[in-house]
From Swiss-Prot:
The lineage of its organism: Eukaryota, Fungi, Dikarya, Ascomycota, Pezizomycotina. It is found in: Cell membrane. Residues 235-246 have a biased composition (Polar residues). It comes from the Eukaryota. The keyword Transmembrane applies. This is High osmolarity signaling protein SHO1. It comes from Podospora anserina (strain S / ATCC MYA-4624 / DSM 980 / FGSC 10383). The gene is SHO1.
Length: 317
């Protein structure tokens, strides 16, 4: 059995290729035009910012004089909200266009939270005025606040969340092979796995009497196993890939007989031609799954083809 650090492992080559492509991302309008959610929300945000900017500009120029007991001066902190949202919307545009959402989503959510506070404060200072320009600026800030709330929910949710996975299923740009390799084939780089299990069940037989090896690495065996005449349990390639570790693809895996789970593909996947155990599938295709532990699931297609599939391309039904 080749060790886990073998340079000939297809999985390690995937990881290395993912690291190389990670630094080559360029801005592409196709990532926005091909994503209806990003196109709609960014367009509304830019339009709302333009309304807020010109409304605030005319309200600041044409502000009426103060009367006794009434302060009619324009709230200057509104300009800080306008400037902040300009860079915020541009930043979201750049992140989505460069397909770097999984890299910067935490920072985006933090900035969106600050922007929501600023926009609601600006609305409070403008909405109660009877001046048309201030009301227009307040309307723009309200639209920005609404888009911000939607963005916080989207960017703050895991890619495996049902609402976000449903929204991402309409994005055509996420179908490119470059995005699939960068986001998912790096075993932890990009979209997280949909299963929280990190270790498959241990193999136990009555003949071993509790002396089986609990370690996933074959070279680290317990003293009881070394002193026993019974050979260690066989660990297949499937068990290694279930733990997210690259394994050997020398032999085929005997498929299980039961597939109690059903999963839907949220991305298309092309099997590695050097690994006979992987299976290809198309977006929105329904697969039957036998085991949902680990990053690789044993799956069966409707035509009867069986193999292993990356769990972060699938969502359980």
């Amino acid at each position: 059995m080749p060790n886990y650090g073998s340079l000939h492992s297809p999985s390690l080559r995937k990881m290395e290729q993912s690291r190389i492509q990670y630094g080559r991302k360029r801005l592409s309008l196709g990532n926005i035009i091909g994503d209806p959610f990003a196109l709609a929300t960014i367009s509304i945000a830019f339009l709302a910012w333009i309304i807020s900017f010109f409304g605030s500009l005319f309200a600041h120029i044409n502000q009426p004089p103060n009367t006794p007991g009434v302060n009619n001066s324009f709230p200057l902190y509104t300009w800080w909200a306008v400037v902040f949202y300009f860079f915020l919307v541009v930043g979201v545009f750049i992140v989505v266009a460069s397909d770097s959402v999984q890299t910067y989503h935490v920072a985006i959510v933090g900035y969106l939270g600050c922007g929501l506070v600023l926009s609601t404060s600006a609305v409070h200072g403008l909405i109660y005025s009877n001046i048309g320009s201030r009301e227009a600026a307040a309307a723009g800030m309200i639209l920005l606040a609404m888009v911000t709330i939607v963005w916080i929910f989207y960017f703050g949710s895991a890619p495996s969340a049902v609402p976000r996975a449903y929204i991402d299923s309409f994005a055509l740009a996420k179908e490119s092979s470059t995005n699939r390799q960068t986001m998912n084939t790096g075993y932890g780089i990009g979209r997280p796995e949909t299963s929280t299990s990190v270790q498959p069940p241990q193999m136990y037989t009555a003949q071993l009497n509790g002396l089986e090896n609990p370690s996933p690495v074959g070279g680290m065996q317990s003293s009881g196993m070394r002193n026993s005449a019974v050979p260690p349990p066989f660990q297949s390639t499937l068990g290694q890939k279930s733990n997210g570790l690259p394994g050997s693809s020398d032999g085929d895996i005997a498929p299980p007989t039961e597939y109690p789970y059903r999963a839907k593909a949220i991305y298309s996947y092309e099997a590695n031609p050097e690994d006979a155990n992987e299976i290809s599938f198309q977006k929105h295709e329904i697969l039957e799954v036998s085991d949902v532990s680990g990053r690789w699931w044993q799956a069966r297609k409707e035509n009867g083809d069986t193999g292993i599939a990356p769990s972060n391309y699938l969502i359980l039904l």
